[in-house]
């Protein structure tokens, strides 16, 4: 504003002499243009940047599992990766060979991903399978928000304009804004160097398992560790992405080659994968479908579980229905509510229970709120669920965004009973290391326990992460629960003795190891 005011004052003075009017909007565009031109020049010049067609990049990186760590505000579980990428900026295509390490992985896991022509393919060994539109969008952003592509787009943007300057890390930055790839972006240019320091944009990610739940997601990508490369081009080697104010990913490039000759088959995707991808894209546009209905108690149709990628259940009580879990998406929960009304006509849904702070586990809770249904949740999850209910959904409005309603939560801090009769429910906060923000749901008349997300099927054994299983077992023992069968978010009905046997095997193995 100071710059515009200065120009206006100068223009006012000039009116008395040569009558040269200058508008603030023109000044903003001119100054923005000059900022971009300086940045392009510092990066090597427009002609050199435009000549970058392909790249081969090697990097190390990590990702914070913001969506499913022990605490939503950190510290977060970390996943590490080492990757080599072939990029075709003109085509918008990318091939990545990577090895990943993380929780539950004793060794690195190798895989390849190819994204081209709006299709994403995963290759593991000789197996190829379709991925989702989430990977297509991620690659699109990786390529289009690279600093050289960003600055070239700014040069030709019709709506390029300057915003008030600011400071980042104590240093002054000029700020420009424009529309890039149909997204409004804001770029911060370091006053001292002229180089891009960060870019911000906001968008919805309806195809993302984790990010769809937050509606309009705020992104901030910082560029650091610039290096002058052969050919006179200056690019950053480190990229740090934050989403909704939390650090998300970090990558450090260890080797980069510009304009290499790429193999002709670098971006080949099999016809079968293309067909399967399009089918999955159509089928999964609003998240996975509701699972297969199965009785929780054989011969009793008042208790039904829907078994799929994200399990949930309907419990009939004398005074109404209780929904157990509203995971993954509004559409998934709408389907669950439709089943409740179909199976139990004229019986109201009196409550819903959400048992975890993992994002996909509460992804349909906004639909519950939109239907005016009270919700039982762990007391420790009040901050994240409140933030979720108040999240902006302007780009892809859900039911709650279209018709706002107040949320009614019952925050569970100790044993809480819902209903009476044979299907009464008892809620118990887990209060353990891995599941401190999870909750058990016990069906005392049926000796049935819902273990939230702590007990999951394993790939190389009966269960994933035996520590989680131990904590679920200990929590049930602490509350003096008599359990014969159990089920969870990702595991169908199973005998509790399987848990006991698996823990006994682990304890026996540990005892022998200690003796040796």
Identify the function of each model-found stretch.
Residues 37-127, 159-164, 330:
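N-terminal mature ectodomain segment of secretory-pathway/periplasmic proteins
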Residues 240, 473-516:
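Divalent-metal (often Zn2+) His-rich catalytic cores of metallo-beta-lactamase-fold enzymes
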Residues 30-34, 114-185, 191-195, 203-217, ...:
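Flexible, processing/modification-adjacent segments and terminal tails
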Residues 250-318, 416:
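Zn-dependent metallo-beta-lactamase
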Residues 295-340, 438-457:
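Conserved beta-strand hairpin/beta-sheet module of binuclear metal-dependent hydrolase folds
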Residues 331-376, 478-483:
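Active-site metal-binding motif and surrounding structural segment of the metallo-beta-lactamase
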Residues 169-271, 442-444, 451-452, 457-479:
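Gly/Pro-enriched, hydrophobic low-complexity segments
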């Amino acid at each position: 504003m100071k710059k515009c005011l200065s120009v206006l004052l100068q223009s006012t003075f000039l009116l008395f002499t040569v009558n040269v009017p200058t508008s603030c909007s023109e000044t903003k565009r001119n100054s923005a243009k000059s900022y971009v031109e300086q940045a392009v020049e510092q990066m090597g010049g427009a002609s050199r940047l435009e000549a970058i067609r392909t790249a081969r990049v090697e990097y190390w990186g990590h990702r914070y599992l913001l969506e499913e760590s022990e605490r939503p505000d950190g510290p977060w579980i970390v996943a590490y990766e080492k990757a080599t990428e072939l990029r075709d900026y003109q085509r918008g295509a990318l091939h990545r060979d990577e090895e990943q390490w993380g929780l539950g992985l004793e060794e690195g896991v190798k895989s390849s991903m190819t994204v081209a022509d709006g299709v994403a393919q995963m290759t593991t060994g000789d197996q190829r399978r379709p991925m989702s539109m989430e990977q297509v969008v991620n690659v699109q952003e990786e390529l289009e928000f690279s600093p050289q592509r960003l600055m070239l787009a700014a040069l030709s943007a019709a709506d390029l304009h300057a915003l008030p300057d600011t400071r980042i890390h104590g240093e002054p930055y000029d700020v420009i804004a424009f529309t890039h790839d149909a997204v409004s972006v804001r770029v911060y240019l370091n006053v001292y160097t002229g180089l891009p320091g960060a870019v911000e944009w906001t968008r919805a990610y309806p195809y993302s398992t984790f990010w769809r739940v937050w509606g309009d997601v705020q992104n901030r990508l910082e560029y650091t560790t610039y290096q002058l490369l052969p050919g006179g081009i200056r690019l950053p080697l480190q990229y740090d992405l934050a989403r909704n104010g939390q650090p998300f990913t970090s990558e450090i490039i260890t080797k980069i080659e510009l304009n290499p000759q790429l193999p002709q088959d670098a971006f080949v995707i099999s016809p079968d994968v293309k067909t399967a991808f399009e089918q999955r894209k159509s089928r999964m546009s609003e998240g996975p479908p509701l699972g297969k209905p199965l009785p929780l108690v054989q011969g009793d149709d008042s208790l039904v579980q829907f078994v799929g990628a994200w399990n949930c259940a309907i419990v009939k009580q004398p005074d109404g229905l209780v929904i157990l879990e509203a995971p993954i998406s509004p559409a998934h929960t709408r389907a669950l509510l439709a089943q409740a009304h179909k199976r139990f006509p004229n019986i109201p849904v009196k409550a819903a229970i959400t048992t975890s702070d993992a994002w996909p586990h509460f992804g349909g809770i906004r639909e519950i709120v939109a239907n005016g249904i009270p919700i039982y949740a762990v007391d420790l999850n009040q901050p994240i669920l409140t933030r979720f209910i108040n999240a902006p959904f302007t780009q892809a409005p859900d039911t709650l965004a279209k018709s706002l309603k107040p949320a009614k939560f019952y925050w569970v801090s100790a044993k809480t009973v819902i209903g009476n009769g044979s299907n009464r429910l008892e809620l118990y906060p887990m209060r353990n290391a891995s599941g401190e923000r999870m909750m058990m749901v016990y069906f005392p008349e049926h000796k049935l326990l819902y273990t939230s997300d702590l007990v999951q099927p394993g790939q190389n054994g009966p269960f994933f992460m035996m520590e989680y299983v131990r904590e679920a077992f200990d929590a049930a023992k602490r509350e003096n629960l008599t359990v014969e069968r159990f089920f969870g978010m990702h595991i169908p009905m199973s005998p509790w003795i399987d848990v006991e046997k698996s823990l006994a095997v682990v304890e026996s193995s540990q005892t022998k190891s200690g003796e040796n």
